[in-house]
UniProtKB/Swiss-Prot annotation:
The family this protein is said to belong to: Belongs to the universal ribosomal protein uL16 family.
Listed name of the protein: Large ribosomal subunit protein uL16c
MF annotations from Gene Ontology: rRNA binding; structural constituent of ribosome
UniProt organism field: Paulinella chromatophora
Keyword Iron-sulfur: no
Signal sequence range: none
């Protein structure tokens, strides 16, 4: 599973997820992509489960690019622990996702739209976010629209 080799600080605050993704929101490597529609955290286990689902369906047909990396530690305290006495230990790693972020890309000479769409659908089931399937040529028509608040 994905995790940083070393970090400057072991523990982080939770933070806030505001706005839309300004980086990593366009297709860069493949012809097809899975784009997040809402904000949230994706754990390294969920990324790995999605990757496995896609590679099993595609077999040796094409190439898959993972465009997110879990670099935020999530700490937890032991169950039935009293309040106080510091912050818990890092238990797992998450990637912070904003709307519009490209999560996975897929491409290759043997990958058709139907194969890519089905593989991305299988990966979508493993994720806790709403996502959208994108195609490189028609990306302008399927851009993310932000709701007026």
């Amino acid at each position: 599973m994905l995790s940083p080799k070393r970090v400057k600080f072991r523990k982080q605050q939770r933070g806030r997820m505001r706005g839309i993704a300004t980086r990593g929101n366009t297709i860069a490597f493949g012809q097809f992509a899975l784009q997040a529609q809402e904000c949230g955290w994706i754990t390294s286990r969920q990324i790995e489960a999605s990757r496995r689902a896609m590679t099993r369906y595609v077999k040796r047909g094409g190439r898959i690019w993972i465009r997110v990396f879990p670099d935020k530690p999530v700490t937890m305290r032991a169950a039935e622990t009293r309040m106080g006495s510091g912050k818990g230990n890092p238990e797992f790693w998450v990637a912070v996702i904003k709307p519009g972020r490209i999560l996975f890309e897929m491409g290759g000479p043997e990958i058709t739209e139907t194969i890519a769409r089905e593989a991305m659908r299988l990966a979508q089931y493993k994720l806790p976010l709403k996502t959208k399937f994108l195609i490189l040529n028609s990306q302008e028509s399927e851009t993310l629209v932000t709701p007026e608040v």
